[in-house]
Amino acid sequence: MANETMGIALGMIETRGLVPAIEAADAMTKAAEVRLIGREFVGGGYVTVLVRGETGAVNAAVRAGADACERVGDGLVAAHIIARPHREVEPALGNGNFLGQKD
């Protein structure tokens, strides 16, 4: 069974607070051709923002998002890219619905 997201990278930025998360999301989507797939309120004020796209674009987007987040105080907790998430990871991402979004 073919998976349309195979070969598509996943970029994640975790922040301390909503304002750095919004700043990171804005910078990521402006910096490269990526799709913002959502955000997750992790708890304790932590927010994770996720993007998908080609590996190079996601890499550039996550760098830009992390830089932007750092300019908003000490909001950056972590930034990470998974170049080709294994197909078993995809169900954990869902359709974006667990992120509070609807298709």
UniProtKB/Swiss-Prot annotation:
Signal peptide location: none
Assigned keywords, A-Z: Bacterial microcompartment, Carbon dioxide fixation, Carboxysome, Photosynthesis
Listed InterPro entries: Bact_microcomp_CS (IPR020808), BMC_dom (IPR000249), BMC_shell (IPR050575), CcmK-like_sf (IPR037233), CcmK/CsoS1_BMC (IPR044872)
Chain ranges of the BMC domain: 9-94
GO CC entries: carboxysome
Domain notes: The tight homohexamer forms a small pore which is positively charged.
Family the entry assigns: Belongs to the bacterial microcompartments protein family. CsoS1 subfamily.
Protein name: Carboxysome shell protein CsoS1
Species, as recorded: Synechococcus sp. (strain WH7803)
